[in-house]
Amino acid sequence: MRSDVIKKGLERAPHRSLLKALGITDDEMRRPFIGIVSSWNEIIPGHVHLDKVVEAVKAGVRMAGGVPFVFPTIGICDGIAMDHRGMKFSLPSRELIADSIEIVASGFPFDGLVFVPNCDKITPGMMMAMGRLNIPSVLISGGPMLAGRYNGRDIDLITVFEAVGGYKVGKVDEETLKAIEDLACPGAGSCAGLFTANTMNSLAEALGIAPRGNGTVPAVHAKRLRMAKEAGILVVELVKRDIKPRDIVTLDSFMNAVMVDLATGGSTNTVLHLKAIAESFGIDFDIKLFDELSRKIPHICNISPVGPYHIQDLDDAGGIYAVMKRLQENGLLKEDVMTIYLRKIGDLVREAKILNEDVIRPFDNPYHKEGGLGILFGNLAPEGAVAKLSGVPEKMMHHVGPAVVFEDGEEATKAILSGKIKKGDVVVIRYEGPKGGPGMREMLSPTSAIVGMGLAEDVALITDGRFSGGSHGAVIGHVSPEAAEGGPIGIVKDGDLIEIDFEKRTLNLLISDEEFERRMKEFTPLVKEVDSDYLRRYAFFVQSASKGATFRKP
């Protein structure tokens, strides 16, 4: 066993002595040592219950004959970090999470690992660490929050953000806003729609590294604790058989994950995260795969923020394995990839049942004929940009409008809420990329303001920043190269016409080639002052969004 390096031989008496200080017995020294990394804390709603999930994992490890050891990592709630300096640290925290786990699991040679995350950057950060370390591993998340209820309908955090915009234009009164605020988030779990956290936890199932139900079983259901025990049992079996993450996760696994992402209409952030995770697993993954597959995979699940359903409804309908059953029915699922169950995913999916034909529609009756995400290219995005196609209003699928340019998200939000943005405008927010922010903040407030102000069917927004999984509308993020790296988004001027064609996947600045070249030659990127040592280092090392916003290799 990997842990024998600290357990066996006379020379390891000091190591055993320290382990015995923890209460470890001689009998336990002969068993597999299982590390359990948890992002439990008392400030994130998605994490506040992870201590209970961890206790269930520990029970499962012991049931299977292993010895559990819990260690922590950090986490940030993007909702609480929104609209202030804290959002600059959200995406950068992903790299710290992966690094910190790699450090601990290298300093202590565990035989296996169980990863217990739940929210936006924590799940991908842990998956990156899993790929780097390549130790027998299972991921079990904390699960989604239940939707809130107000006035006879399900609501969630995005309802609150959009109600703020509604209040500004007199569509929502203060009493209603307060009621929505009080009821939207009823308890523990990752926010209830198909936002980034729930998308990533769902894709962990599709990759074969998490138990069935990982992405959809509600946080407060007892089934979540039973799944956590199962995760503890499974990891010990993987250790005994020496089955590592890279034995399970292949390019075909990523293709399954992308197809699930497209079919469900997942978060645009998955493009960033899957690219980064694939790199950690040593897999060459081109983001163009999203666009190639989106032409084949229809959008079949209408889940918040683009539809009326929530994650609990998807769970009731059969969950992610039922979505994969639709892929299997149409001959698209890569069936031969392995899973933590030591069974091929095709065999497991055959056992799944689709329990609601509207929540998980058949391919011949989709919500949209193409997948939920698209990659756009053009003179404004030579390395690509990302859009949530499932959230684009039909009348905005092709749009030409004048640019209204902002150098950060706050100024854009103020302009939108004060009525300065008119129908037909294209809001351009730049210097919000990985390097330029730094930190590639989410532009949830400006997009929610557009919706709340009643402009969602008339105004587009493009940015080198990113979006919350809760953003929807004619919005395009991850424009690459970013302005801070000399990208063409930096040469856009107020009043310039911008053409967006979601059908053709193009994003272009409508000026002459000569004018374009002249501006690019004269362009000097704005350099912002950065008041954080970590963010200065992050900005120095981070790569483009098209490369997953990972660090450059030394």
From Swiss-Prot:
Its EC number is 4.2.1.9. InterPro entries: Dihydro-acid_dehy_C (IPR042096), DihydroxyA_deHydtase (IPR004404), DiOHA_6PGluconate_deHydtase_CS (IPR020558), ILV_EDD_C (IPR056740), ILV_EDD_N (IPR000581), IlvD/EDD_N (IPR037237). The keyword Lyase applies. GO terms for cellular component: cytosol. One of its GO terms (biological process) is isoleucine biosynthetic process. PROSITE patterns: ILVD_EDD_1, ILVD_EDD_2. Binds 1 [2Fe-2S] cluster per subunit. This cluster acts as a Lewis acid cofactor. The keyword Lyase applies. [2Fe-2S] cluster binds at C119, C191. The active site is at S468 (proton acceptor). Pathway: Amino-acid biosynthesis; L-isoleucine biosynthesis; L-isoleucine from 2-oxobutanoate: step 3/4; Amino-acid biosynthesis; L-valine biosynthesis; L-valine from pyruvate: step 3/4. The modification N6-carboxylysine is found at K121. Keywords: 2Fe-2S, Amino-acid biosynthesis, Branched-chain amino acid biosynthesis, Iron, Iron-sulfur, Lyase, Magnesium, Metal-binding. Functions in the biosynthesis of branched-chain amino acids. Catalyzes the dehydration of (2R,3R)-2,3-dihydroxy-3-methylpentanoate (2,3-dihydroxy-3-methylvalerate) into 2-oxo-3-methylpentanoate (2-oxo-3-methylvalerate) and of (2R)-2,3-dihydroxy-3-methylbutanoate (2,3-dihydroxyisovalerate) into 2-oxo-3-methylbutanoate (2-oxoisovalerate), the penultimate precursor to L-isoleucine and L-valine, respectively. Belongs to the IlvD/Edd family. This is Dihydroxy-acid dehydratase. It comes from Thermotoga sp. (strain RQ2).
